[in-house]
């Protein structure tokens, strides 16, 4: 009995060569629309699906393969009962289904209007794929050109057939998830209300050597059609990115961009293990980098750096004496790239990608599920800061408090930041008590704490932090407020002659 293959693909990579090989092996080929035109144009004998169904394509191609002559041939078990039913209807079996789907994701990604996006929701393709995958014992299902060579073997094992079926269902599942995400994104309920059902449409974009540690496999995935500054960054110099490099670069860039939106000048953020360790703003990138580096030279070693303005040759040279893992910037001049490649060949130098379609959701894995929330993207201008002490902050202290607030918001809780003149002088992050975070920040600052301001991402349960800060020379404090002992903390500030500002906005980060 002659074997039959149905080929209908949007991605035509390798399809002519594959079809030619099948035809040479005696297969009868069926096809539709553009694929039929491609194959027949290449001189390959092929029948139109409409010749098999006896029914023309209709509704501008929306209905082509949704017919018993097609799905009966795919779904029939190769046993007497099913084959007899096919014979009674003069339907032949279909032994191979090679289908990939309308380019829905790509259509969304290029910003096509809604009617065009909707028209690129494939109906017949997923139906054929799912039918073939269900009957994979008898039907080979191919959704990836990488599997064409396998299908040309004399025998395909049951295990390989099952693998191809699983791959096919994954293909349609991801496709449906992309459609769901698109349609849900148009809902008036988002982003102010989390949906009852949330699909994570993830596509692997990079394979890394391992995850956080060598014994953990790891990879980088794209969520839907989103584009990000780090996952879509251009690596212009240095080694391939690691799992930890991606995580730290994303944290550094996020904080850098938040500060750049509220500060005048160039911003530099140095990060270690997703926590800021040196942050500064200055007139140019070179100066901002030098100030951020000098804020904590010990912790910056082996860190990841993000800057808000292009890196030129002079800025590149100023990084010569410090070992860094990653530098990410909006641009890097060609002479700076050449210098990095020659003088710091291990440094990964990234030109940030342009964010597009980024979800407002922050998704954290739990055992058996996910914790989902809206991202903490509240800007300073949304706050209503209130001075709650007798002493008012000076103009410079206000500027430093605003700067410190953004920095501490980007650190892991419990977190305290000391800042002065647009640079961090002491940081304490990831502490299990607030006083320990303050002690670490103040110890890190040393004499630079004199005249600095202090910001905390959450309230003070006691007056111990403000007393410690005042003893180190801190002159102004910022915190959300809202603790039971707020009156005691305010009284301590008045007693010590320092200012305190309540923001009314907590910023835990776990």
Curated annotation (Swiss-Prot):
Residues 1-143 form the MGS-like domain. The IMP cyclohydrolase activity resides in the N-terminal region. Gene3D superfamilies: 3.40.140.20, Methylglyoxal synthase-like domain (3.40.50.1380). Its EC number is 2.1.2.3, 3.5.4.10. PANTHER family: BIFUNCTIONAL PURINE BIOSYNTHESIS PROTEIN ATIC (PTHR11692:SF0), BIFUNCTIONAL PURINE BIOSYNTHESIS PROTEIN PURH (PTHR11692). InterPro entries: AICAR_Tfase_dup_dom_sf, Cytidine_deaminase-like, MGS-like_dom, MGS-like_dom_sf, PurH-like. GO terms for molecular function: IMP cyclohydrolase activity; phosphoribosylaminoimidazolecarboxamide formyltransferase activity. It catalyses: (6R)-10-formyltetrahydrofolate + 5-amino-1-(5-phospho-beta-D-ribosyl)imidazole-4-carboxamide = 5-formamido-1-(5-phospho-D-ribosyl)imidazole-4-carboxamide + (6S)-5,6,7,8-tetrahydrofolate; IMP + H2O = 5-formamido-1-(5-phospho-D-ribosyl)imidazole-4-carboxamide. Belongs to the PurH family. It holds the Pfam family MGS. It comes from Deinococcus radiodurans (strain ATCC 13939 / DSM 20539 / JCM 16871 / CCUG 27074 / LMG 4051 / NBRC 15346 / NCIMB 9279 / VKM B-1422 / R1). This is Bifunctional purine biosynthesis protein PurH.
